[in-house]
Amino acid sequence: REKLEVQCQAEKVRDDLQKQVKALEIDVEEQVCRFIELEQEKNAELMDLRQQNQALEKQLEKMRKMDLRQQNQALEKQLEKMRKFLDEQAIDREHERDVFQQEIQKLEQQLKLVPRFQPISEHQTREVEQLTNHLKEKTDKCSELLLSKEQLQRDVQERNEEIEKLECRVRELEQALLSVQTLSKRWRTRNSFGAVEPKAELCLEVQLQAERDAIDRKEKEITNLEEQLEQFREELENKNEEVQQLHMQLEIQKKESTTRLQELEQENKLFKDEMEKLGFAIKESDAVSPQDQQVLFGKFAQIIHEKEVEIDRLNEQIIKLQQQLKITTDNKVIEEKNELIRDLEAQIECLMSDQERVRKNREEEIEQLNEVIEKLQQELANIDQKTSVDPSSLSEEADSLKHQLDKVIAEKLALEHQVETTNEEMAVTKNVLKETNFKMNQLTQELCSLKREREKMERIQSVPEKSVNMSVGDLSKDKPEMDLIPTEDALAQLETQTQLRSSEESSKVSLSSLETKLLQLESTVSTKDLELTQCYKQIQDMREQGRSETEMLQTKIVSLQKVLEEKVAAALVSQVQLEAVQEYVKLCADKPAVSSDPARTEVPGLSQLAGNTMESDVSALTWRISELESQLVEMHSSLISEKEQVEIAEKNALEKEKKLQELQKLVQDSETKQRERERQSRLHGDLGVLESTTSEESGVFGELEALRAESAAPKGELANYKELAEKLQEELLVKETNMASLPKELSHVRDQLTEAEDKLSHFSEKEDKTEVQEHGTICILEPCPGQIGESFASQTEGAVQVNSHTQTPQIPVRSVGIQTHSQSDSSPEEVAEIISRFTEKIEQMRELHAAEILDMESRHISETETLKREHCIAVQLLTEECASLKSLIQGLRMPEGSSVPELTHSNAYQTREVGSSDSGSDWGQGIYLTQSQGFDTASEARGEEGETSTDSFPKKIKGLLRAVHNEGMQVLSLTEGPCGDGEDYPGHQLSESWLEERRAYLSTISSLKDFITKMQVQREVEVYDSSQSHENISDWRGELLLALQQVFLRERSVLLAAFKTELTALGTRDAAGLLNCLEQRIPRTEY
């Protein structure tokens, strides 16, 4: 048995092993299929990547070609500019050579024409030698300039070669990019087996991070180089400005030197004429005695000495001119260097753009490589999860991966070598920049030396003027001695003296003109300072005016808000009164239908007519009230839009404030610059500086004119705001007229009510007579609480509907009639239970109302305060900005002072508005109080008049109804405020808790109405079932009418007393206000 069991188990094990082997074979086949599919997919991806790389290579070649073309075009343009510049310089130098040759020829001719005296000839030979030396020096300088030109051309060629080298480097970098792409391909192939050796991946990631760090460092270096280039540009601009100023001064000095040279040439001609005349005189005077000849020779020696002094002065002037020519040549060299520096900057910018482009391409390629690596890693992870790898295949793959890693490392070394080459290139560029810095420093030093030489030139120019004055004085002293010379010599000397005097006078005139110009400029500066001070004063005045205007506008806004609140409250109170009167009329019309005599059949028709008329009037009034509410909503929306406009205007005002501050800074800077330049002009006499200050002042005034144009825009905005305010006032007046028409309609409705009451009293008298005749005795009737309750319920319903502003359908009041067939017995226990329920509900509602009332009050107060503050701040800012702009404009238009327009708004109108709003609020409060007091007194009067009824539950119902009414009126008074304060509370945005409370409130009112109708039906059935009752007791309807009349009389007396107090308070101060009050109060008090 054991053997059999062992055999069976062995067979089972063998079967299991065979099954496992089959399953493993199936798995292996599936894995092989998957590997084949993966290899196919990888091959397809590799083909796609090759195609993409080929496309990228083509695009790169195209981009290279385009870049090379652009660079070649730019270089050709630069070469053309350089050629043109060199041609122009060559033309200028040839022109200068021609001028120098002409001057040399003139000087040679003058030397030939000079008479041949022995002492004079030696001196002139010396001068000729000096001049020849000067000419040799000038020719040497010209040759040096030619050599410098050739050097510049060589520098241009060297830089072109450098540009070509840089292009070769760019190509090398592109090749490096291609090698990076090949690396990326190999990386992808390697990462397909990345799960085997994660260490290699980590090494590659570390290398990538190192490359990225190196790229970041290079970017930082590039940014630093850019900043240095910007600094060099600013320095170059400043130096170019200084060079331009020096050019201007040199041109002025050239003009002065040319004028002086012309004068000296004229003097030389005159001197030659004099010498010829003297030679003739000497020939004629051979017969003169030797003593006279000695005197004449002594005088001639003096004259010759004076002329030698003049010749020395002329030589000094020639030296100065030569120095000026040197300065001009130096300036030209500086300009050439500046142009070369600009060219270098342009080349550096091109290189920077190329480097940025290469860097961006590298980053994009690295991102693509990272994405591909991530995808391959995910695929490998999935494959590793699904399949298991054989050790032999793993070893082969590891060997292949090691081989690939070796290749990648070699390529990385090549890349590092390329990075080192790029670093070396960056170092070369840094050296170039340092050289440019050194050149710039040299140029600054040269400019400083040129300035010093210029100052020396100015000092030297002042010296010959003094010598001229001294020579004039010597000539004036020697006049009596020269009287012995013949008349021709005297005339020649007089001519020279007159010429000297004319030159002195011209110099004096020029100096006086310069002094007058300086005085004019100083006066203009002082006037402009005064204008600026006036502008500042006017700005302050306009700010104060703006503040006063904002305060006036705030007071007007507050008064208008109060008027709106009071009018809304009055409209709501009138609506509640109309609804109460309408329901009372319905009840009064339904009651006479109880009578059973045929004479009572006339009553329902009349009551229906009165009810129809009342319903039509009430519907018209409700329609008008809804229109007023819609207008209020529009007003709220317009206020919101105005607030938005005010915010926009505030932003514009802030921007204009910033602009004004900038202009003030510019004005201050210009003032400081003016002072500094005035000092410089006084020290050096530089008129160019003053001209620049005047130009800057003109620029500042142009900016002020632009500000004037900009300030016209806020003026237009202010005008628009004023127009909007006027429109709002007109709309308020229209609404006031509509509200004034409402009391007239109310009085008309009240008249109709009085007529209906008279008819009802007449019919009630008839009913009393018939009842006395039929029954003889009538039981004592308590005043029916159903009517009062229903009237109060209707009032509360109206209050809830007004507060919620939702179009909820009113709950229809059940018509109370005599239902003889429906007799319902109600025990006192049920009544007590109902009363307890209602009391509990009322207490819950009171608690909820108290909590919500507190929340509403706090929210309302906080929101109103925030809105008022924001509005006040906005208006203040706007008015201040507008005032400042107005003051600026007026100050610029009227520099002597402008009369500030005073805001004379009508205070009488404001006081009238406030008075009318106060009177309207007093009237609304009086109506509200008298109405509530009237209902309370009427109910109390009817309760205290002593009906002998055994049941006590109607009094409890009265108390419940009073509580409900009081809470409804509290809700009314609280919910009317936010609607009038300018806050927009539409009906569809009410909270859910408020809607639930309203529903509970309406359900309690409907249940009360049902209960009251039941009690009323029961009472009336008992009255008509009882055959005998007391005789001499009046009907409850007559008592109710008397109570209503008393209430209305009390209202009238209260209103008359209030009116008298207002009349005594006002007196005869405002006749128009009194008339308005009378017109408003007469239709209200007439009842």
UniProtKB/Swiss-Prot annotation:
Job description of the protein: Scaffolding protein that assembles several protein kinases and phosphatases on the centrosome and Golgi apparatus. Required to maintain the integrity of the Golgi apparatus. Required for microtubule nucleation at the cis-side of the Golgi apparatus. Required for association of the centrosomes with the poles of the bipolar mitotic spindle during metaphase. In complex with PDE4DIP, recruits CAMSAP2 to the Golgi apparatus and tethers non-centrosomal minus-end microtubules to the Golgi, an important step for polarized cell movement.
Basic and acidic residues bias locations: 667-685
Entry note about domains: RII-binding site, predicted to form an amphipathic helix, could participate in protein-protein interactions with a complementary surface on the R-subunit dimer.
InterPro entries xref list: AKAP9/Pericentrin
Coiled coil: 5-461, 614-773
Protein name: A-kinase anchor protein 9
Statement: the UniProt record of this protein carries the keyword Cytoplasm: yes
Subunit record text: Interacts with the regulatory region of protein kinase N (PKN), protein phosphatase 2A (PP2A), protein phosphatase 1 (PP1) and the immature non-phosphorylated form of PKC epsilon. Interacts with CIP4 and FNBP1. Interacts with chloride intracellular channel proteins CLIC1, CLIC4 and CLIC5. CSNK1D binding promotes its centrosomal subcellular location. Interacts with GM130/GOLGA2; leading to recruitment to the Golgi apparatus. Interacts with KCNQ1; targets protein kinase A (PKA) catalytic and regulatory subunits and protein phosphatase 1 (PP1), to the heterodimer KCNQ1-KCNE1.
Signal peptide: none
Subcellular location: Golgi apparatus; Cytoplasm; Cytoplasm, Cytoskeleton, Microtubule organizing center, Centrosome
GO molecular function, one term: molecular adaptor activity
Positions of region (PKA-RII subunit binding domain): 559-572
Alphabetical UniProt keywords: Coiled coil, Cytoplasm, Cytoskeleton, Golgi apparatus
Main localization category: Golgi
Tissue expression pattern: Highly expressed in gastric parietal cells.
Keyword Cytoplasm: yes
Organism classification: Eukaryota, Metazoa, Chordata, Craniata, Vertebrata
Cellular component GO terms, alphabetical: centrosome; cis-Golgi network; Golgi apparatus; Golgi stack; synaptic membrane
Region of interest: Disordered: 667-691
One of the protein's GO biological processes: signal transduction
